[in-house]
Regions:
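Alpha-helical secondary-structure segments
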Residues: 27, 104-111, 145-151, 200-201, ...
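N-terminal lobe/hinge region of extracytoplasmic solute-binding protein
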Residues: 29-82, 113, 195-199
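Gly/Pro-rich hinge or "lid" segments in bacterial periplasmic/extracellular proteins
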Residues: 64, 166-225, 347, 351
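Surface-exposed binding/hinge segments that line
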Residues: 90, 127-180
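Ligand-site clamp/hinge motif
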Residues: 190, 218-263, 391-393
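Append "and occasionally in soluble cytosolic enzymes with long acidic Gly/Pro-rich linkers
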Residues: 214-221, 296-383, 387-388, 448-450, ...
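Extracytoplasmic/peripheral linker and loop segments enriched in polar/acidic and small residues
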Residues: 302, 391-402, 407, 416, ...
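Long beta-strand-rich cores associated with HINT superfamily self-processing modules
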Residues: 497-522
Length: 522
């Protein structure tokens, strides 16, 4: 433990040492201020969710090379159960948690049950099954030590059910270890904020909030990861991250601005890796905000679509790192809309505002993450909206604070991303186009958009088994949100990551924001 503390201190004390990173350790510079918890039942931020993929395993996963396909992970195979709304899973007989405890069907049942009962941010994904506190106990049947039957009451097919089980919230935790660390019936949630109990390639060795996260190779993992240790170094400033990667003080650097990426492309000691991403970026209005009723006026939503200078954002400000995208399904997903019906048109926006009774000088606050590209985009939005005499007050905050504000509806407007939790159109439709009384606190709930009819259509699309009909339903859902909603989808990103040349075998999934650490070599 002393050596690990020393390791954290080494990269936390000074940037002037310029020491080469250890051969058995990957050092990554990335902001860590968005992390709230490492409990897979609660984690819902990009960095912590991406860490989940390296420390926990699900029954199945999206294939790393072809994410439209499914690959076995903790389950060696699966088949239909006793009804069309059930599946039988057979577990790997030799899988073990980092504690040495074997992975059993009881761990699977415990993990999914606790996620439903904790009812944290990502629990709405499992709610797609129709699972509730009241019925979850009756949804599983143990067939033998390595086989269980899972069922669900919701009208969804087996393919969507499998996709839901690839999300981090469906990760399998070590029930014995977690229960040993439970306090006041919290299912071990408090302990898992800063610890891990998984069967993935790595385990959490040490975490210092906002400063460093140390992952150590899980000695029980099979196969073993190529490196012994991963150090995520919390570096809040993008300029400092660029300096660290140039000096060789870190091996990988994330969240660099367009100008920094351009400059690093000329450095012969490193390269820029580009990975496809499912992240879509949107402007959202809190329609329930009492201080500014204009936010609930559809005229403002409509005008906003014509006050975003999409071309300038994508090509000039962000230098092509982000493409124009105006629908909630990301490019690459089945049925994603590729059209771009909106462009920058101040005169049209003014006309819409006037007809809708939005007075000149209308003002609202825009909450954004205090990192690129959010600050840059927010300033551009502030300037473009001002041309129509709509005043935006910028409120940059740490990422963790932004998520807390969103979940508490404590904001007026927001510019942020949404990433797919699994590779299926339902992952984004259930966020942008679903909000029912007493239901999950989706994105539509967070902006206070009451949509009973649209929510019903979202459920219909989720349960449709005919591929062509399902695609048509998602097209209609996208068009509705695209044309008339408090969401203005603007961009889709591609992950551009600076990597030192001595680092190889780097790969990143479409739905995550960090590398798969188990394959990385130095």
């Amino acid at each position: 433990m002393r050596s690990l503390i020393l390791l954290v201190a080494l990269w936390g004390s000074s940037f002037a040492l310029h020491a080469a990173t250890p051969k058995d350790t990957l050092v990554v510079a990335v902001p860590l201020d968005g992390i709230i918890s490492f409990d897979p039942a609660e984690s819902f931020e990009t960095v912590s969710n991406s860490v989940q993929r390296n420390i926990y395993q699900t029954l199945v996963e999206a294939d790393r090379n072809s994410p439209q396909k499914l690959s076995p992970l903790l389950a060696t195979r699966w088949q239909q159960g006793s009804t069309p709304h059930s599946l039988i899973f057979t577990l790997k007989p030799d899988a073990r948690f980092s504690s040495g405890n074997p992975v059993t069907v009881q761990d699977v049942i415990f993990s999914l049950t606790r996620a439903v009962q904790l009812n944290k941010a990502p629990s709405f994904i499992l709610a797609e099954f129709g699972w509730t506190n009241e019925n979850i106990a009756s949804q599983f049947k143990v067939l033998n030590d390595h086989q269980l039957e899972m069922q669900w009451p919701a009208q969804i097919g087996q393919n969507l059910a499998l996709r839901l089980l690839t999300a981090p919230v469906a990760s399998v935790v070590d029930s014995k270890t977690v229960q040993q660390n439970a306090v006041n019936n919290d299912f071990g949630n408090g302990w898992l904020h800063t610890h891990s109990a998984g069967s993935g390639a790595f385990t959490i060795q040490q975490y210092v909030p906002q400063q460093a996260l140390v992952l150590s190779a899980n000695q029980q993992a099979n196969p073993q990861p190529k490196l012994k240790r991963i150090l995520l170094k919390g570096v809040a400033d993008a300029g400092a991250r660029r300096l660290l990667i140039q000096q060789g003080d870190v091996d990988v650097a994330y969240q660099l601005g367009p100008d920094q990426i351009d400059a690093l492309k000329r450095d012969k000691n490193l390269r820029i890796e580009a990975f496809p991403s499912s992240l879509v970026y949107y402007l959202g209005f809190n329609t329930k905000d009492k201080a500014q009723p204009a936010l609930g006026n559809p005229a403002l939503w409509q005008a906003a679509r014509w006050l975003v200078d999409y071309q300038s954002l994508s090509q000039d400000l962000l230098k092509g790192q982000y493409r124009i995208h105006q629908s909630f399904l990301p490019q690459g997903f089945d049925g994603a809309l590729e059209d771009q019906p909106f462009h920058y048109d101040v005169a049209k926006a003014k006309e819409i505002l006037a007809k809708g009774g939005i007075k000149p000088g209308t003002k609202f606050a825009l909450t954004v993450i205090n990192q690129p590209p959010y600050i840059d985009v927010a300033q551009a939005l502030q300037a473009s909206f001002a041309k129509a005499d709509v005043q935006i007050e910028l409120q940059p905050v740490a990422e963790s604070e932004l998520w807390s504000k969103m979940r508490g509806r404590d904001f007026q407007s927001i510019f942020i991303y949404w990433g797919a939790d699994y590779v299926d159109p339902n992952t984004n439709a259930s966020a942008f186009a679903y909000n029912v009384p007493g239901g999950s606190k989706t994105l539509a709930w967070r902006v206070g958009w009451d949509i009973p009819d649209l929510s019903a259509k979202t459920r219909t699309a989720a349960g449709e088994s005919d591929a062509a009909k399902r695609r048509a339903l998602y097209t209609d859902l996208q068009k509705t949100v695209q044309q008339n909603s408090p969401f203005v989808v603007t961009l889709q990103g591609a992950q551009q990551v600076a990597v030192r040349n001595n680092v190889s075998h780097v790969q990143q999934g479409i739905g995550v924001s960090l590398l798969f650490f188990d394959t990385v070599q130095k």
